[in-house]
């Protein structure tokens, strides 16, 4: 493995990798058939669990008053493929990944998943090198600011409700207009949102979209998902 790449990864992660073979494996996709060192799949499996644990720990300390429901939504957002892929691109990892010829035109969701997998595989290598303490600075560097920004401006209530419902058991929110009143130039919509296993809520607004958002907010607040007092530092 090129020394320049190893030095670059040290600058990006803050970790001096001890096992060069595992590092090569973390950057190798399964489509590389003649690869002697194997691919990143097993490492990604381990790294996914390490990432989840350290993000959960970080959120537990950052938001001491947050409910379990809110912490779960935040965790899901911070460890999902899109966030990990964004971090991979921030680190310019895609340029380092070895892929087979047929995979060089990856795009869309498959590309996002591959970039995310490599981040998790690198986390596994760090963990195997030196345990959780070897990974924690890397998590702080790339995830802590993202965790804090999530509270600086709330995400769309419908998006957050959908994520929360998924965590509860692959449920999906269903929205239904139950009433429309008022003149055409000043309408009032009432929308009911329901999730299997939970009581429904009704929102009201000047548009269908606003009414849906209000209904989603009611469930998020009722279930304690939207209730936060933020702590400034994660130590």
UniProtKB/Swiss-Prot annotation:
Keywords: Cytoplasm, Endonuclease, Hydrolase, Magnesium, Metal-binding, mRNA processing, Nuclease, RNA-binding, rRNA processing, rRNA-binding, tRNA processing. Its main location: cytoplasm. Its EC number is 3.1.26.3. CDD domains: DSRM_RNAse_III_family, RIBOc. The active site is at residues 48, 120. It catalyses: Endonucleolytic cleavage to 5'-phosphomonoester. Mg(2+) binds at residues 44, 117, 120. Residues 6-131 form the RNase III domain. GO terms for molecular function: double-stranded RNA binding; metal ion binding; ribonuclease III activity; rRNA binding. One of its GO terms (biological process) is tRNA processing. Its cofactor is Mg(2+). Residues 156-225 form the DRBM domain. The keyword Magnesium applies. Belongs to the ribonuclease III family. NCBIfam families: RNaseIII. Homodimer. This is Ribonuclease 3. It comes from Bartonella tribocorum (strain CIP 105476 / IBS 506). The lineage of its organism: Bacteria, Pseudomonadati, Pseudomonadota, Alphaproteobacteria, Hyphomicrobiales.
């Amino acid at each position: 493995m090129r020394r320049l790449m190893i030095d670059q990864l040290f600058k990006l992660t803050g970790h001096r990798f001890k096992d060069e073979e595992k590092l090569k494996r973390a950057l190798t996709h399964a489509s590389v058939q003649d690869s002697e060192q194997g691919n990143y799949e097993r490492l990604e499996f381990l790294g996914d669990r390490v990432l989840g644990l350290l993000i959960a720990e970080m959120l537990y300390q950052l938001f001491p008053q947050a409910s379990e429901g809110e912490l779960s939504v935040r965790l899901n957002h911070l460890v999902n493929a899109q966030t990990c892929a964004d971090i991979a691109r921030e680190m310019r990892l895609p340029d380092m990944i070895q892929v087979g010829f047929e995979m060089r035109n990856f795009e869309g969701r498959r590309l996002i998943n591959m970039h995310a997998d490599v981040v998790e595989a690198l986390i596994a290598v760090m963990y195997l090198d030196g345990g959780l303490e070897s990974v924690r600075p890397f998590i702080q560097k790339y995830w802590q600011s993202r965790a804090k920004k999530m509270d600086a401006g709330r995400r769309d209530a419908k998006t957050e409700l959908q994520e929360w419902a998924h965590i509860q058991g692959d449920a999906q929110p269903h929205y239904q207009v139950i009433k429309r009143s008022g003149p055409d130039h000043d309408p009032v919509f009432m929308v009911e949102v329901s999730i299997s296993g939970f009581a429904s809520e009704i929102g009201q607004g000047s548009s269908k979209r606003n009414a849906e958002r209000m209904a989603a907010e009611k469930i998020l607040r009722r279930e304690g998902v939207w209730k936060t007092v933020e702590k400034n530092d994660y130590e």
